[in-house]
Each structure stands twice: as structure tokens, then as C-alpha cells.
A protein has these predicted regions:
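A detector of single, family-specific signature residues
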Residues: 1-199
Length: 199
């Protein structure tokens, strides 16, 4: 069954139980099929795997899903709304940018260490030192090396701005969310964790 054939196919069926592994696009299809009146249940793939009886094929996977969805002890995944998926996309993007920021800081520190300059840990220390390089604070570092390090620092500054924008979006979304507010009353749970749990 091709993707474009899914909705017409399920539209013709009487409402029934549909089991799917909770993976890429499953929440979208869960919403679409639920709108047609079907009962959709998403299951973590790791739990479905226990019901696979033979090699990994589409038929064996479908059989395992059919078996797993009828089990009374199966743990199901709630179908996420578009709003919940949006905030999860924000979290994933923020996480990616933070990892890239860490890589850039480490690269700047490593490049400077090659010239005998040790930078204290932290983004601000790296950016401050790069600013001093531009002003000529280390004349023995070749101009080409300074250009390369400055390019990394510019990218780092850009990432800082982007992460700041995502943090503002996260705060704005969380401000009106009762679940996030309730979760934040738990000691040690901040806005990032609370919004991720709420999504």
C-alpha cells in the first residue's frame, strides 16, 4: 500500500482497531486514521519486537504488530497533537544547536591550544579571547589561523542567538500551558524538562 493510497483504503473500511509501531510519521497517521473513526494504538517498537516469530520482513512485522496490539498488558503510546509535535521539534532542534555550539567551542579551544593559548572552559571565555585576537593580542598567530578561528567564533555567536530565540519560544509556549506549570512545582524540574514532559 503506497502512502497516497492509505487514506482512500482506510476510508472504505468499517471502523476497526489499527496497531502501529510508534516511529516516524506514526503520530500523523494515527491522527488521520482516528479522524476516519478507527481506533489507533501506537506501540513502542521494542515491545513489538518480542512478538516477531521469524526473520525481519514486512509480513513478520505486521503479524507481530497484530499480535501485540491485542495483548492486555501492552503499553501504548498516546498519539501526539500537532502542537505537541511542534514543541518536540523545538526541543530536538534546540538540543542539536546546543551540541553544535559545544563542538564549536571545543574546536576553537583546540585551534588556539595549537598555538599555545589555553582558553578557560565556557563560551564567553572563547568569544572574549577571539575578540582579543582580532585586536592583535597574539601577533605570533598567523593571519590565516586568526581568520579561521574568527569564522568559528562568528558561527558560535550565531548559534547563541538562535538558541536564545528557541528559548524564548519555549518560554512563551510554556507560559500558557497548565501541565508545564504543574510540573515546574516539582523540585528540580525547570522549564525545559517540564515542557519536554508535557509534550
Amino acid at each position: 500500500l503506497r502512502r497516497r493510497q492509505m487514506i482512500p483504503f482506510f476510508r472504505k473500511l468499517e471502523p476497526c482497531l489499527i496497531g502501529m509501531e510508534a516511529c516516524g510519521t506514526s503520530h500523523h497517521w494515527g491522527r488521520e486514521l482516528s479522524d476516519l473513526g478507527h481506533q489507533v494504538k501506537l506501540m513502542p517498537p521494542v515491545y513489538v519486537k518480542a512478538y516477531v516469530k521469524r526473520g525481519k520482513t514486512d509480513a513478520a512485522g505486521a503479524e507481530a504488530i497484530c499480535e501485540a496490539v491485542t495483548r492486555p498488558t501492552m503499553r501504548f503510546v498516546a498519539i501526539k497533537s500537532p502542537e505537541q509535535q511542534s514543541i518536540l521539534a523545538l526541543h530536538r532542534t534546540r538540543d542539536l544547536l546546543i551540541r553544535q555550539r559545544t563542538q564549536l567551542v571545543n574546536m576553537i579551544r583546540a585551534q588556539l591550544a595549537e598555538f599555545g593559548i589555553v582558553v578557560a572552559k565556557g563560551i564567553q571565555h572563547a568569544l572574549r579571547l577571539v575578540g582579543q585576537l582580532v585586536e592583535g593580542a597574539a601577533p605570533d598567530i598567523p593571519a590565516l589561523a586568526v581568520k579561521v578561528i574568527v569564522a568559528l567564533a562568528e558561527q558560535l555567536s550565531d548559534l547563541q542567538v538562535r538558541i536564545g530565540h528557541l528559548d524564548k519560544e519555549l518560554k512563551a509556549w510554556s507560559r500558557d500551558n497548565a501541565t508545564v506549570k504543574r510540573l515546574q512545582t516539582i523540585p528540580g524540574i525547570g522549564i525545559v524538562t517540564a515542557s519536554a514532559l508535557a509534550a
